Amino acid sequence: MINKKDGVYNRFRGNFKYIKQKGGIGVDMTYCISMPNRISHAKKKMKELGGNYKLFNAIRPDLLTTTDYATMSLTYFPGFMSFNKKTKLPVALSFFMCYYDALVNGYDTICIFEDDIDFPSGVDKIKKSISEFKNIDHEMLFMGYCHLNCHDGYSRVSEELIDVSGTHLVCNHALCIKRTFIEKYLKGKPLFYPHHNDQVLSLFCARNRIGTVVPNVSLVNQKREEMGSQNGNNRLMPDTCNFNNI
């Protein structure tokens, strides 16, 4: 397979299913990436959020070829983080599909959710944070995250949002993203993943000074203890930060 972004997009665009429903969270499109055995849970959570969305049937390892892995990752190279971990590239490409689809369709602001999510603070807090995010210059909102140093001198940019630009944070289970970022991210790098998807994203944001915010408290968590992991991440999710007192 020729390693081109449009080629990958055309190959897997049939994995999208457009679902209409009432309501909305204030973005041009919401995406939910789901494995087949989690679609029921994913649809339930998307119904709680409200609004039209695109369900993306996650790319699986059996849908990729040896050439895919060799030309788009370091899966076959000993000593690297992704060595012999065949679930990592499919995850990255599933997110790529959502990014690329947003560009193709001209969406200005999107949100992407994974299929094992929960909303511990309720949907109204999510909507409020998204509304504030759309009115600031920052380009990336992590509604949920992990491995963020909670004591690094962050600053408040709005009632619900904290500026964490330039810091290292991972876990991509709930993102809101502006088109300006997607353009930089896709045009600024080849379709190649030397690390796990969330590590590649975090490094890109830090190196390119992408304005990044998180909410006062995590608004979207992963139900890893209850649902497990289908991506080899079997450790329980670490605690997130509470920035209400900043």
Question: Could you tell me what each predicted segment is?
Answer:
Residues 2-113, 117-246:
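An acidic/histidine-cluster motif and surrounding catalytic segment
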